[in-house]
Amino acid sequence: MSNSPPSSSSSGKGLSIPRKLALNAINEIQNRSNDYLLSKRGGKGLEEGRKRAALAAVISTVSSVGADRLTKADFDELRDLSEQESHDKVHFMDKLTNKLLDAIPRRSDESMDELRKRLEDRHRVEQPGLSIKRISRNFKTLSSKMDLVFSLQYSIIHVISWDKPSLTLTFLILYTWGCLMPYLFLVYPVFYVLTGVLIPNYLYRHPLAKPDIIPTRARGDSSIFGFLRTENAWELDRQRILLERSRTLERILSQELELSTISSRTSTDSEDEGSSSLFYEVFTADSKSNLVFKAVLEEDEETTEKGRTGVVDKVKLLINMRDLQNLTSDIIKMMTRMQDSIYENYSFKDEKRSTKHFFNLIALILITIVLGPYIPWRAIFIITVWVLILLKHPNRQHILKQLKPATKHKLPPKHRTEVKRRASRLGELIVDDPPQYRTIQIYQIEKQDLIKPSVYELYMYSSSIFNESDTLRIQKKDPRGLPISHWCKLPAQAGNSRKRIGQWTPIRDPGASKTVSWMRWRLTESGHMTSPASIVVAVLCVRLSDTAGHQKSDRGSTMIPEPVRRKAV
């Protein structure tokens, strides 16, 4: 950002004294902001870079208001904002926005009052300030977690448009039952968790044996309600457009993956990022902030009324951007906690815990269906909401202390141990399922040295064997892969795919043979080999006899390593 404000009269010729003071104050704020940013660039001060872009919008807004309306005392106070910023709880942008609203003529406008109330809200003051880098990272993270929302959206569209008549009729039947028996609306979510989360995760951990059946061509309609399916021209055209769109998206994604195989690892959700990830975030934040604030600065040119209306719209835009940023942060935290809870409790990571949840959900469904007509649901809903709201009262701790009894009735030690022993018996489960392993092959591709033909150097780790029949090798292209095995990730179906291979610790495999040609790494969830669904990563050495064009044939793998196991940290 240049040190001159974005005004056509920045040269200073023909300006009044208050306007000159205004320009000097704005320049002073800019210089202090830039000096503060440069002094903090080496550490955590990188987060303060958001004020540079925000200051551009504020300068444009102050200029459009008219600096003649501000007094010298106001400019002195604005000059001191950057110094008081780290000591005051009120954000830098909020202070400037309040001064901006004070400079606008007093009129009975509901939008102005609403903006003031939002700025002075104590809950809003406690939230983080506006940061283009943060909001861009939130949108990127949120877009990767919206699969469930999008699948729900398309499911609703399929139900309404009769794309799947059986699904539409099932929805109508379930909705009718829910209207006749309202307590079933509590059963439906539990039933979805049971059939849509628990059972698929169990089948993934314990796959069923598929019988060898000769495949035959499907005859007739796939559903008995096929005559209800709509096959008009509009529907066929919509399906054709969706198919072309999906193919185009796959082609674009494949091209992006070819170009950004290694750089994609900088996409992370953590706040404490490395230098490469931080560079990626700053670069994307700068490009997005330029687009956003360019639209803010050009808004005056598009509006017919360049006075007070344009200023209010700009202030409202900044406030809404900050609220949207904090809203997306809360949504991401909530979705992350939900995913972690589902993975810990319902993915059969711990067989006993997930099995207990399975039986508890079945018992809850049966009890609700059988005893549902006799349960006072209205009283339960009323009391539940009242209790939840009262528990959020600021003086709840004082009230709860008064309600607690002064002396607690404690059981004797013998009775206490007996109760614990009976409770532990009720929760005992025996899981006798044999361990099952899935193999993931990672090929260690090596190059032959030109000077010493007997020496091979590591080239990369790849998911493709890169043999003579490989498409890339036929086209005389380099294989796709990663130079370091620590960057290799598990597939998404492996559960917690955030753990990389390099984060596993090796332990000896006493039962394995010493003459195998694969290096096997087994991923267990709890640190030992009792998990029924472990991951085996097989690393097979592939040696290339030519380093330039990969024209010659592969030599046989002579890599016979000691088998090791790797378990999750």
UniProtKB/Swiss-Prot annotation:
Chain ranges passing through the membrane: 179-199, 357-377
Broad class of the protein's primary localization: membrane
Null allele phenotype: Results in severe peroxisomal defects, caused by reduced peroxisome-endoplasmic reticulum contact sites. Leads to defects in peroxisomal matrix protein import, membrane growth, as well as organelle proliferation, positioning and segregation.
Signal peptide: none
One GO cellular component term: peroxisomal membrane
UniProt-annotated stretches for the region Disordered: 549-569
Sugar-modified residues: N31, N326, N345, N467
Stored Pfam families: Pex24p
One of the GO BP terms on file: peroxisome organization
Keyword tags: Endoplasmic reticulum, Glycoprotein, Membrane, Peroxisome, Transmembrane, Transmembrane helix
Membrane topology term: Multi-pass membrane protein
Subcellular location: Peroxisome membrane; Endoplasmic reticulum membrane
Its biological purpose: With PEX32, contributes to tethering of peroxisomes to the endoplasmic reticulum for organelle biogenesis, positioning and segregation.
UniProt cross-references to PANTHER family, sorted A to Z: PEROXISOMAL MEMBRANE PROTEIN PEX28, PEROXISOMAL MEMBRANE PROTEIN PEX29
Family: Belongs to the PEX28-32 family. Peroxin-28 subfamily.
Name assigned to this protein: Peroxisomal membrane protein PEX24
Native organism: Ogataea parapolymorpha (strain ATCC 26012 / BCRC 20466 / JCM 22074 / NRRL Y-7560 / DL-1) (Yeast)
Gene: PEX24
